[in-house]
UniProtKB/Swiss-Prot annotation:
Species in which this protein is naturally found: Coturnix japonica
Protein name (record): Proliferating cell nuclear antigen
Gene3D superfamilies cross-referenced by the UniProt entry: 3.70.10.10
Post-translational modification: Monoubiquitinated by the UBE2B-RAD18 complex on Lys-164. Monoubiquitination at Lys-164 also takes place in undamaged proliferating cells, and is mediated by the DCX(DTL) complex, leading to enhance PCNA-dependent translesion DNA synthesis.
Biological role: This protein is an auxiliary protein of DNA polymerase delta and is involved in the control of eukaryotic DNA replication by increasing the polymerase's processibility during elongation of the leading strand.
One BP term from GO: translesion synthesis
Length: 262
């Protein structure tokens, strides 16, 4: 039996919004330690890894490990029926072919009960190696989303150049080019408004903006985002989910563009 109750149900709604445009179906791994998901996107270019720890839920019970195949569009549609203030409970029997979703208003006066059909999915687990990164940039998540959105009007790829004093985002396209430079902030009252850079060596890498714009759908999950980069390994875009876990997106750099000198 699996049952998880989340008083702040809007977190779960935001998690689905962050996933559903990138991956259509995925296997949710339910265990005593929490819920996790790992999936390549449908074009096998990027990877998503999500962790929601059991202690982040208000009550959590999972008697045995369950792999639950879920159509994320279907789950998102059902979660849209929950109000932002609703308490959400997820429930499944051990060998169930459905997941129950229960939404309660805070005053308990309205209870909505949905059942979603589960899928049989063959999922290969990819090992994600632990990695030391040359540059780690932490910045406001809304700022990163804005940069990706703005530069996607200029070109379809962004060059991210990271140095000790700042990080630069550049794009080239038919209409010209655009460059946005963020300097490391020296003193900020609110930590979530800071730009901090930890650099072992400078990095300049090119990434497809189409995927970064998918990743930034996770912006409502966290006020900050962390970008971890090294030459020849995938970029990691990480959003911390307060007290619960994280969503990490991995995207390999574009190589052919760099050889053409762009």
């Amino acid at each position: 039996m699996f049952e998880a109750r989340l008083v702040q149900g809007s977190v779960l709604k935001r998690v689905l919004e962050a996933l559903k445009d990138l991956i259509t179906e995925a296997c949710w791994d339910l265990g005593s330690g929490g819920i996790s998901l790992q999936s390549m996107d449908s074009s096998h270019v990027s990877l998503v890894q999500l962790t929601l720890r059991s202690e982040g839920f208000d009550t959590y019970r999972c008697d045995r490990n369950i792999a639950m195949g879920v159509n994320l569009n279907s789950m998102s549609k059902i979660l849209k029926c929950a109000g932002n203030e609703d308490i959400i409970t997820l429930r499944a029997e051990d060998n169930a072919d459905t997941l129950a979703l229960v939404f309660e208003t805070p005053n308990q006066e309205k209870v909505s009960d949905y059942e979603m059909k589960l899928m049989d999915l063959d999922v290969e687990q990819l090992g994600i190696p632990e990695q030391e990164y040359s540059c780690v940039v932490k910045m406001p998540s809304a700022e990163f989303a804005r940069i990706c959105r703005d530069l996607s009007h200029i070109g379809d790829a962004v060059v991210i150049s990271c140095a000790k004093d700042g990080v630069k985002f550049s794009a080239n396209g038919e209409l010209g080019n655009g460059n946005i430079k963020l300097s490391q902030t020296s003193n900020v009252d609110k930590e979530e408004e800071a730009v901090t850079i930890e650099m072992n060596e400078p990095v300049q890498l090119t990434f497809a903006l189409r995927y970064l714009n998918f990743f930034t759908k996770a912006t409502p999950l966290s006020p900050t985002v962390t970008l971890s980069m090294s030459a020849d390994v995938p970029l990691v875009v990480e959003y911390k989910i307060a007290d619960m876990g994280h969503x990490k997106y991995y995207l390999a750099p574009k190589i052919e563009d760099q050889q053409e000198g762009s």
